[in-house]
């Protein structure tokens, strides 16, 4: 599964977090894969895309790496737009006024 991890920097101060990344390094439990991250220009939030099959790995990661940084975390399960298109496709031809699928007969 994919998870969007939204990290909030305490007082918009990224220095403790980046110091943590540089000095002892960030560790990831086996099975948790970091895919990428994006930082807001004002240093308010960091958005990290992570992948794992067990959400407990995210809990382990937070506890092992972030307790002394002042960050808060929101972890949101997400689905790619390509996978969502597959789910939505069968419903695209429904007639909302008829309350079901369009009939061609």
Label the predicted regions.
Residues 1-35, 39-45, 53-57, 78-105:
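Short S/T/G/P-rich N-terminal loop/turn motif that feeds into the first structured element of a domain
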Residues 15-16, 59, 70-73:
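A short, polar/proline- and glycine-enriched secondary-structure boundary/capping micro-motif
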Residues 24, 64-68:
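Conserved short hydrophobic interaction patches
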Residues 47-48, 74:
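Short, flexible active-site loop motifs that bind/organize anionic cofactors or intermediates
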Residues 48-50, 61:
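Functionalized membrane-embedded alpha-helices
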Residues 57-64:
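Short, electropositive alpha-helical surface patch
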Residues 68-80:
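Conserved short beta-strand edge segments in small beta-sheet-based binding/regulatory domains
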């Amino acid at each position: 599964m994919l998870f969007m991890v939204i990290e909030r920097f305490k007082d918009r101060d990224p220095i403790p977090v980046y110091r943590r990344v540089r000095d002892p390094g960030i560790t990831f439990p086996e099975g948790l894969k970091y895919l990428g991250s994006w930082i807001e220009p004002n240093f308010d939030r960091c958005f990290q895309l992570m992948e794992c099959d067990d959400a407990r790995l995210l809990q382990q990661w937070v506890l092992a790496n972030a307790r002394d940084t002042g960050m808060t975390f929101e972890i949101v399960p997400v689905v790619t737009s390509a996978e969502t298109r597959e789910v939505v496709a069968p419903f695209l031809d429904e007639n909302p006024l008829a309350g079901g699928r369009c009939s061609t007969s």
